[in-house]
A protein has these predicted regions:
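N-terminal start-of-chain detector that recognizes signal peptides
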Residues: 39-40, 108-110, 229, 248-250
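N-terminal basic, low-complexity leaders that serve as flexible interaction/assembly modules and, when applicable
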Residues: 1-88, 125, 223-224, 323-344
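N-terminal small/glycine-rich loop or linker at the start of catalytic domains
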Residues: 12-44, 73, 78-88, 96-100, ...
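A gly/proline- and charged-residue-enriched helix-loop-helix capping module
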Residues: 89-128
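The substrate-binding groove and active-site-proximal loops of carbohydrate-active enzymes
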Residues: 42-46, 107-116, 282-286
Length: 344
C-alpha cells in the first residue's frame, strides 16, 4: 500500500488524515540545534548521512506521516553558479545580484546528479529508513520567490527591484525564469528518481504580486514544474488568497492554504477535484493548548471528512515552538480523524 499522504493527495479514502509540518526538520529540535552549533545549513546538506538524520528526527519524535527532505530552496542555484550565503537572522544573501541579461546568461542549468549528488544520496537513505506508510516529501522553491532573492540580493517584503525587472526588462525576467524553472524541474525529478514520494513547490513570496502579474510573470513557470512530475504535487504560497484559483490552474494535486484563508472557503475556490493542505496558524502553538485544540477541531470540521485533506500548519513551525506540542497536535488530528473514518 502507498504512503498515507500519497493516498490523501490523490483523494483516495484514508484511515485518518495525514499530518506533517512545514519546517518540521530543523530549528525546534534538539538534535538539529546541536548539529548547527558546528555546521552551517549547506554543510549539513552536503553530508548525506547527517542530512538524512535531520530529516528523520521529526518523524521519530512527532510520529508525523511524512518526512520532508531537509534542504534550502536556494540549494539548487549554487549549481547554477550563484554565490549565496545563508546569513543568520537575515536569510539568503547574494554577493552579485542579477541585474542584466548578461548576468542571466552566466547562469548554468546544471544536472542534479553533478550539482547536488549529496542530496540525492540523502533522499535514498531516508526513503530506505522510512516505514512504507510514511511518505518522503521533496521540495523546491517557487521560481518567483527564488528569482526575487537573486535580483534583490537579500530578503525583502516589497520586491521593488524584482518588479522593476519584470516591468522594465521583461526579456531579462523571462530568461531568468526559464533557467530557474528548468533547473528546479530537473532537481525535483531527480529527487523523485532517488525516492521522493511527493513534491511541494514553496512559492513563499508570490503573494507580493497582483493576480494579473502573477498570471503573466510567475504562473507559467510554476506550471512547468508542477506539470512535469509523475508523483503527487503540493502547491503552496503565503498571502495568496487573491491568487488561489490561478494557483490551482497552474497546477498541484494539492493546494496549500496559509492560515489567513478559511479552509472550507479555500477548498471551494480551488475546487473539490483536488486536495488541500493546512492550515493552522503556527503562532497558535505558542499559546494555550485549549485554543490549539479548538482551532484544530474547526479546521477538521471544515474539511468535513472529504478525501484530499492533509493537515499542516499555515506556514512553517516557528523557532520558539515546543516540540512536544507538535507531537500532541499530531496525536489530536489522528485521534479525531481516525474516529470519523471508523464511523463511516
Amino acid at each position: 500500500m502507498e504512503p498515507l499522504l500519497v493516498r490523501a493527495a490523490r483523494r483516495q479514502p484514508v484511515e485518518r488524515t495525514p499530518v506533517w509540518f512545514m519546517r518540521q526538520a530543523g530549528r525546534t529540535l534538539p538534535g538539529y540545534r546541536a548539529i548547527r552549533k558546528r555546521l552551517g545549513l549547506f554543510d549539513v546538506c552536503r553530508r548525506p548521512e547527517l542530512c538524512a538524520q535531520v530529516t528523520l528526527e521529526p518523524v521519530e519524535l512527532h510520529g508525523v506521516d511524512a518526512a520532508v527532505m531537509f534542504a534550502d530552496i536556494m540549494l539548487p542555484v549554487i549549481g547554477m553558479g550563484v554565490d549565496v550565503q545563508l546569513v543568520e537572522n537575515v536569510g539568503p544573501v547574494i554577493e552579485h545580484p542579477v541585474e542584466s541579461v548578461e548576468d542571466v546568461r552566466k547562469l548554468q542549468v546544471p544536472e542534479p546528479e553533478e550539482s547536488v549528488p549529496f542530496i540525492l544520496e540523502a533522499v535514498g537513505l531516508v526513503r530506505r529508513a522510512l516505514q512504507p506508510d510514511k511518505a518522503l516529501v521533496g521540495f523546491c522553491g517557487g521560481p518567483f520567490t527564488v528569482a526575487g532573492y537573486l535580483i534583490e540580493g537579500r530578503p525583502t517584503r516589497d520586491f521593488v527591484r524584482t518588479k522593476r525587472c519584470m516591468f522594465r526588462s521583461p526579456e531579462v525576467w523571462h530568461e531568468l525564469m526559464e533557467r530557474l524553472s528548468e533547473t528546479f524541474l530537473r532537481y525535483v525529478r531527480a529527487k523523485v528518481e532517488a525516492g521522493a514520494d511527493a513534491i511541494q513547490l514553496f512559492d513563499s513570496w508570490v503573494g507580493a504580486l497582483t493576480l494579473a502579474d502573477y498570471e503573466e510573470f510567475a504562473a507559467p513557470y510554476s506550471e512547468r514544474i508542477l506539470g512535469g512530475l509523475s508523483v503527487p504535487t503540493i502547491h503552496f504560497g503565503t498571502g495568496t488568497s487573491h491568487l488561489l484559483e490561478s494557483m490551482a490552474a497552474a497546477g498541484g494535486d494539492v493546494i496549500g492554504l496559509d492560515w489567513r484563508t478559511p479552509l472550507a472557503e479555500g477548498w471551494e475556490r480551488v475546487g473539490h477535484d483536488r486536495g488541500v493542505q493546512g492550515n493552522l496558524d503556527p503562532a497558535l502553538l505558542l499559546g494555550p493548548w485549549e485554543r490549539v485544540e479548538a482551532s484544530t477541531d474547526a479546521i477538521l470540521q471544515a474539511a468535513g471528512g472529504r478525501p484530499g485533506h492533509i493537515f499542516n500548519l499555515g506556514h512553517g513551525v516557528l523557532p520558539d515552538t515546543d516540540p512536544a506540542s507538535l507531537r500532541r497536535l499530531r496525536e489530536l488530528v489522528h485521534e479525531r480523524t481516525a474516529a470519523v473514518a471508523g464511523a463511516k
